[in-house]
Amino acid sequence: MCTGYNFNWYWFYSKWSTDRTGSTWCEAVEMKKFLIEKLNIPENAIIIEPHARHTTTNLRNCVRLIYRYGMPFNKACITTTSGGQSMMITNTLAARCLKELNEVPFQNGKRLSETEAEFYPAIDALHINPTEPLDP
């Protein structure tokens, strides 16, 4: 849990809203509200990505936003999630991305804790798949 805000940080929340048919609720939007209202994180430090359908596209789409906003590709980013999901990201997600997306949009960095790991954006994330109708 964040105990303070560092003004050099940006928070990305990536979660698709339409995995529930007819739902108007979006986890990324709700998490943004929580960060602003409960943790006093400035709104301009929060970037949401509501299009990803699963972890492969979560990371790919976040890397695209990192590029779009001119953030450096040589600086580590941090994923924060459950322990099991974090282990999957660092151990098997690259192979899954290659299989499902035909590219790996990140390079693993250091494991920081059971629930946190570094990654570095990869330029391959910028490839658009013309056969994928939901590829933003």
Language-model regions, residue ranges each:
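A structural signal for short, hydrophobic/glycine-enriched beta-strand patches
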Residues: 1-136
